[in-house]
Amino acid sequence: VADLGGLSPALTVVVVVYRPRLEEFSACLKSLLAARADGLDLHLSLWHNDLGVQQTPGLADLYEQLQAAGLPLQSQGGRGNLGFGGGINTLMPSLRTPYTLVLNQDAIPEPRSLVLLAQAAAADADDVAAWEMRQVPYEHPKDYDPVTGQTEWCSGAAVLLRTAALQAVGGFEPRIFMYCEDVDLSWRLRCAGWRLRYLPRCAVVHHTYSEPGEVKPLALLGSVYANLCLRTRYAGRRQVLQGLGMALREMLAPQSFAGRRWGIAKGIARFLRNYAYFRATRQAAPGFEPRFAGWDYEVRREGAFHAFRPQAEKQAPAPLVSILVRTHHRPGFLRQALVSIAQQTHRPLEVVVVEDGSSDGEAVCGEFAARLDVRYFRLDPAQGRSRAGNRALAEARGEWLGFLDDDDLLYADHVEVLLQAAGAANVPGAYGLAWCARTRVVAEAQGQVEESFRSVEPDEPFNRLRLWHHNLMPIQAVLFHRSLYEQQGGFAEDMDQLEDWNLWTRFTVNAEFLQVRKLTSLYRVPADFAEAARRQAVLDAAYDEAVRRQERIKFTADPLRVRHLACDFARQNALIHLDRQQLFSMVGEWPWLARLNLWRSVVWRRGR
């Protein structure tokens, strides 16, 4: 039995059932039984939006088996389809446990995820009302704070709610039958003063899409109606008019599925019938700002359809990964960096912290002794960034290595994403996309900043010629195999700027790297124009020396590699580039060009 450290709150799992696939639903419910075996006190409450157990052959037997195995289970419903939120609202008055886990019938919690979820909720602050679980294989792409885990809204597919908070705001909105009712609930909780968290280390297997980029007609049509309702409740008339304009443009666009225009028109008509209701139930609160991004409600991280593997499909044993942190007299930033590492979904993991000169970081590292395998080293006197990095490399034990300077952050899936991608492509290095966050430092020692703007940069696929010209890979965005360090060595210790660029050029002389189009990290640059200009001037001054050092790099190449480099060079330096292969492909796509090319060949042969 797992030791929950005395933090084992009773919770009720509520599932709205509608014509389930028995095998999938059985796996979902059996995972709850496994959580009870791990020591978690949970109860299951089911609401049938279909006809009940007689609707699905074998379901009654499954319920009996689970009850006999010790799972407290109560099944109700059979009154017709009340919608997802409507079904949960019907169960809400009977909820007596401190926490309620809302779970889709096809969402299967990963082993021990519910135990971790319960521990996190019990240990959290009293003003947190919701803890969202990560969905596998496709994580929802909405952004979240990689330090606090706070998010703007929680998906209803798998979310633990504080029961008192759920009941206080009245549960789900009854006039939103399906889609975006979870956004509305999240925003009402926030307006009532509650905070929401995302817990990526607690996961469910939830196959929401049959293929990447799938268009789901019901979701699209339901979202149009719900979006207009939310604009009415949480924003002004200008946002409502903007939403109606978007809906009309959607009607004029080419149909991606049959009945699309008619479905949107019905959604608009339904919204107009409910406009007065949502206007009368407007919500607002100090500090709450609704976000409408088209039909979405969040800033999104690139990489929505990066496919994660469930635990059962992962490599075993997983390799040890070392995250190497350089720091200097910034304990607040270091603490944030270590929190973002502790949130990593990959295990096993170690952290090597090297402090250059100062000693503030030792106490910070001590705070994480129970959460991380963290080792602290100090250089005294200060010896510079490159020597600090080399000390970290020398101390690392991991098979794979990555850097995280103290003012940068990792999203929780960073190591998992890059390790999986590098393994699938059989390359010794991979790098993800990163936010470039323009910030003003309010209190450096405490790590307090004000962020003004974010962008994804750089965003370039791996290309040696481009890498020889400029750095494609922010230092925290890269994960590499330790064999590269063993072959090429570490940082040039006489470099204090662009030392990472020099390292990447040496690592990739004979090794391929892979760009992974998923955003997994964040680095900060000055928002102040004068400060940014001073920083850029320092980098510019170091650039020529960094380029000169490339003259010392030697590599061998076969004819095929030379040809690829030549093609890359031509493509990189051309304003308009069309190579022979592209021309042949274009000719093949246009029948009249193909016929013209055939006649040209015939005439040419006869002319000879």
What are these regions (language model features)?
Residues 107-144, 413-449:
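Conserved donor NDP-sugar-binding/catalytic core segment of glycosyltransferases
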Residues 100, 401:
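Short aromatic/hydrophobic "clamp" motif used to bind/position activated sugar donors
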Residues 222, 239-314, 536-542, 563-608:
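Non-catalytic, C-terminal membrane-associated alpha-helical segments of glycosyltransferases
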Residues 30-41, 339-348:
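Short, acidic, metal-binding catalytic loop of nucleotide-sugar glycosyltransferases
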